[in-house]
A protein has these predicted regions:
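Beta-strand acidic-aromatic groove motif in beta-rich domains, primarily in extracellular
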Residues: 95-105, 185-188, 274, 532
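Short coil/turn segments at secondary-structure boundaries
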Residues: 99-102, 370-373, 527-536
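Sec-dependent bacterial lipoprotein signal peptides
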Residues: 1-21
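Structured, solvent-exposed acidic/aromatic patches
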Residues: 73-77, 112-172, 176-481, 505-510, ...
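C-terminal functional modules
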Residues: 474-612
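Membrane-proximal, proline-rich intrinsically disordered regions
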Residues: 22-105, 155-156, 552-612
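Short, compositionally biased low-complexity segments
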Residues: 25-30, 43-63, 111-122, 185-193, ...
């Protein structure tokens, strides 16, 4: 293996987001496949005896040299710290440039309010430094941590003792890989799954179908192999910042993830989708049981007793982009409209009109805890108080100056207290700097079950019909936000789809739109999942972007479908020698599981068909 050259400022790069709202990395010259430590830890590998199991191509079916084995034994002491960073940075690293200015906007959750970002990724313009960072974080940093952890767990004197942690690490790697393939499509995977070090500048791609196949088998093998009851197993508890060493929760998460993935491919591979879904729905560990099972990241800013490190930076990602950076990320017009229109049972709020005059309106109670009203100022942000003469106002995605402006702030920002109380978690300022970010929540798992029931899938863990799980999903989302039971009940009783005959109509497409739209509300602010679900189902019915600076890469009137591979792939011989990869490398190209376009050539919304 050739030695890979690593950018010497990796650690600094991961912390820049704390100190600057955004930065352009277009000039960064970095090998995205440069696995850290590949010179002394990659080593020469020797194949084991032939493996004819169905997991042969994902197993670590090789041995390393005695010297490397000895080195890996020594790194076992570092496993807790490595695992902690693996979990923390997984979806979170450089959140603004890798996610907020792309996925969160494409999902319809937020809009860009910073004129200097216009024409870039928020408006379909490709920003190589930004996309390249997402790619590099996965292939360089997270894959290095994954490789080191797996090899440490296997190449020691008692590998059976580390079996649970071996497979827990693989579950999380599959979780990260899902976000990567759902961003780009086809991608290098097979060598990384096996914790190998690929040859520099000649890294083989797998089709997205192959990537999904490998991820399904990773999850199946992991859940079948983990033994939560085995007290002899090595455990990482405090540094497992997701589930604190609870192996059963990891198994429930894996089953929930497997169901998410099964539904993702339901339009392109319905038989495989049903097989994987029913396996998850019949597994003895079940799916997520409550909001206590949420897969989330606690910011380092949070106090230690909350699971953080009581640091001065690394705040909640969305709160940073919205409030800490002075209003760059704001409520979208799409989300504002859904807050207002999905139920007639919203919560009252008052707009002051004068000394003795006011207007009472209703809105989704989650909006009242997540967003400030419009026209916030430095003083009102410092005090954490709404501008009570104003209303909630969302920004259209793709808006340009002067319709977007950092001064004055025209649109709603996240409810965040900037100063002394930033470490607290008040219910009425949900996006305080210490608030965890949920990447997969209990509410989502219930909406997944609703769709599974709608599709006629079966399982011992599927005990209600689609409407029952739909109601439960909305309630779980309200519970997550600590909405009072009376307000939650009023909202649910007023949901339009529960009062207009949708679930009695027999029209599965109509029912699916209700399920996905309310699921989209519950998944907020996870743009990775919101955007993927929108591309898969074409729900919810989002507005078209006002601006398109893709240079024709995304046809006018169309929705963006993927991100481009980073420019560094021009150095990858495999990529440059496969014309089909280059031909598919446009932001308007649908991924494997995205079987139908959202809009026609004139930009008009097409009627979705999710039951082929």
């Amino acid at each position: 293996m050739k030695r890979n050259i690593i950018f010497s400022g990796l650690i600094a790069a991961t912390t820049l987001l704390t100190f600057a709202s955004c930065y352009d990395l277009d000039d960064m010259n970095r090998d995205p496949y440069g696995l850290e430590g590949a010179d002394n830890a990659g080593g020469e590998v020797t194949p084991d005896a032939p493996d004819d199991s169905k997991y042969a191509d994902i197993n670590l079916n090789y041995s390393v040299s005695k010297a490397d084995s000895a080195a890996y034994k020594k790194t076992l002491a570092d496993a807790p710290a490595t695992f902690r960073n693996f979990l923390y940075q997984g979806y979170y690293n450089d959140y603004q440039i890798t996610t907020n200015l792309s996925h969160d906007i494409y999902a319809g959750y937020v809009a860009n309010n910073q004129p200097k970002h216009a024409t870039k990724s928020p408006d379909f313009g490709y920003s190589d430094g930004w996309s390249g960072q997402r790619w590099a974080h996965f292939y360089t940093e997270r894959s290095t941590e994954y490789r080191d952890l797996l090899r440490s767990y296997k190449f020691n004197d008692t590998p059976e003792r580390y079996k649970n942690m071996f497979y827990i690490t693989r579950i999380y790697y599959a979780f990260l890989a899902l976000a990567n393939t759902d961003t780009y499509g086809d991608m290098p995977f097979r060598e990384y799954v096996q914790a190998k070090v690929p040859e520099t500048n000649n890294v083989q791609y797998d089709t997205q179908e192959q990537v999904y196949d490998a991820m399904f088998r990773m999850l199946e093998q992991a859940v079948d192999s983990i033994k939560p009851e085995d007290a002899s197993q090595y455990k990482i508890d405090k540094d497992d910042i997701c589930y604190f060493g609870d192996a059963e929760k990891w198994c429930r998460f894996a089953n929930s993830l497997r169901l998410r993935m099964a539904l993702r491919i339901s339009n392109v591979a319905p038989e495989r989708a049903k097989q994987e879904a029913e396996a998850a729905l019949n597994n003895k560990y079940g799916l997520m049981k409550s909001n206590a099972d949420n897969m989330q990241t606690v910011p380092k800013h949070a106090p230690v007793e909350m699971g953080g490190e009581d640091g001065g930076g690394d705040e909640n990602g969305l709160a940073m982009c919205s409030v800490a950076y002075g209003g760059e990320s704001v409520l979208s017009k799409d989300m504002e409209e859904f807050y207002r229109n999905l139920s007639t049972g919203g919560k009252d709020y008052i707009i002051k009109k004068g000394r003795n005059e006011s207007e009472t309106k209703q809105i989704d109670p989650r909006c009242l805890v997540c967003w400030y009203r419009s026209n916030m100022t430095a003083s009102t942000l410092a005090s954490g108080q709404d501008a009570l003469r104003n209303d909630f106002v969302g920004c259209e995605r793709g808006a340009q100056a002067p319709d977007i402006s950092m001064d004055p702030l025209k649109y709603s920002l996240t409810r965040t207290v900037k100063d002394g109380a930033s470490k607290d978690l008040p219910d009425d300022h949900w996006f305080n700097y210490s608030r965890p970010t949920v990447w997969f929540g209990y509410a989502e798992s219930l909406f997944l079950k609703a769709e599974a029931a709608l599709r006629g899938w079966a399982g011992s863990n599927l005990t209600m019909d689609a409407e029952g799980y739909f109601r439960a999903g909305v309630k779980a989302s309200m519970d997550y936000y600590h909405i009072a039971d009376a307000d939650a009940e009023k909202y649910i009783n007023g949901i339009v789809a529960l009062n207009d005959g949708t679930f009695q109509s027999g029209d599965r497409e109509r029912m699916l739109e209700a399920i996905i739209t309310h699921k989209w509300m519950a998944v907020f602010p996870n743009g990775n999942e919101g955007w993927a679900d929108f591309r898969r189902t074409d729900y919810p019915a989002l507005h078209n972007q006002l601006s398109n600076f893709s240079g024709g890469d995304v046809p006018n009137g169309k929705q963006i479908k993927r991100l481009l591979y980073p420019n560094s792939e021009s150095q990858n011989k495999y990529y440059t020698s496969h014309a089909e990869l280059q031909q598919k490398n446009t932001q308007g190209t649908r991924l494997w599981w995205d079987v139908a376009d959202t809009n026609d050539a004139a930009g008009n919304r097409l009627k979705p068909n999710n039951f082929r």
